[in-house]
């Protein structure tokens, strides 16, 4: 990972966008894994990939956001400028509009059933859009939007490493179910990382989706994983009804949730100091697809 701090951001802004150089720069409290984000004044943000693997998303996401702007029931962050690599920071980066609101993991009072309905509506709208401006799922999306079997080897490695710490038989049952169907319709838009930190709320309602760096065109099953990472009970059922996808897609979605939990727990993915993925795995194993 590249060491990115406020002084580096100030240097990049001063060199490439001096008209913004007087604006205050401050890191956001909750940082993602793929990118580092900084406030730039009150109305802008600076977003910098944390490593080379995430750099290709800068230009792709810019094109996607330009296309999606105004076409969804909620806002998306507009890209104001794209910065070039420099001597001190070797990757492209971007300046964006700052969207107000709290992420859903910061808003403990939100009505999850209403949120589930709203999110399902957003994902339905996303799937309905023309796909010409999007990129076909693949390496750039870390294979979100592809068939989950692309990660079968990682699942097997995880089960071997975890041994008796997990119910391997149930895991294999879910994985088999997930990998024996495929998206048979035309490829559609998917977000690729529908996570609690990428959904903004205002006045208790979903107001924006952010971080479309892994978006693309393909199988939308990956966008349903939040059914296990955040929703449960009535909210999960409301999300399932609102998003309006078939049982086979839900089976693949459960496979995506299983994969992420297993690879994280077996140290094949980003760190999980709060053991969130252990709790996700328990939900995945205890629910029917």
What is each PLM-predicted segment?
Residues 26, 33, 104, 117, ...:
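Helix-rich C-terminal or lid/interface subdomains of diverse kinases
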Residues 33-40, 46, 79, 175-224:
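Active-site acidic catalytic loop and adjacent metal/ATP-binding pocket
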Residues 138-183, 242, 248-252, 278, ...:
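Helical cap/lid subdomains and adjacent loops of hydrolase enzymes that gate the active-site channel
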Residues 2, 22-149, 160-166, 184:
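ATP-binding pocket architecture of kinase catalytic cores
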Residues 1-19:
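Juxta-kinase regulatory segment immediately upstream of eukaryotic protein kinase catalytic domains
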Residues 6-10, 62, 233, 237:
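Short, surface-exposed alpha-helical segments at coil->helix boundaries
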């Amino acid at each position: 990972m590249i060491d990115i701090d406020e002084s580096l951001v100030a240097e990049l802004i001063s060199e490439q966008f001096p008209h913004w150089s007087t604006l205050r720069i401050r890191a956001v409290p909750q940082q993602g894994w793929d990118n580092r984000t900084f406030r730039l004044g009150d109305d802008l943000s600076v977003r910098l990939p944390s490593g080379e693997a995430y750099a290709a998303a800068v230009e792709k996401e810019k094109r996607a956001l330009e296309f999606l702007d105004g076409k969804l029931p909620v806002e998306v962050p507009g890209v104001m400028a794209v910065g070039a690599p420099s001597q001190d920071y070797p990757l492209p980066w971007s300046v964006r509009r700052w969207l107000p609101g709290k992420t859903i993991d910061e808003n403990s009072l939100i009505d999850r059933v209403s949120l589930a309905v709203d999110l399902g509506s957003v994902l339905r709208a996303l799937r309905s859009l023309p796909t010409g401006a999007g990129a076909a799922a693949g390496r750039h999306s870390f294979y979100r939007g592809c068939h989950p079997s692309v990660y079968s080897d990682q699942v097997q490695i995880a089960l071997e490493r975890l041994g008796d710490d997990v119910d391997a038989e149930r895991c294999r049952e879910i994985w088999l179910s997930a990998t024996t169907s495929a998206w048979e319709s035309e490829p559609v838009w998917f977000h690729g990382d529908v996570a609690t930190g990428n959904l903004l709320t205002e006045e208790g309602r979903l107001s924006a989706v952010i971080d479309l760096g892994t978006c693309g065109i393909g199988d939308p099953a990956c966008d349903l994983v939040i059914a296990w990472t955040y929703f449960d009970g009535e909210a999960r059922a409301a999300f399932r009804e609102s998003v309006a996808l078939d049982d086979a897609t839900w089976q693949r979605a459960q496979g995506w949730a299983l994969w992420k939990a297993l690879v994280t727990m077996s140290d094949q993915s980003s760190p999980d100091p709060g053991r969130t993925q252990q709790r996700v795995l328990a939900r995945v194993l205890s629910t029917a697809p």
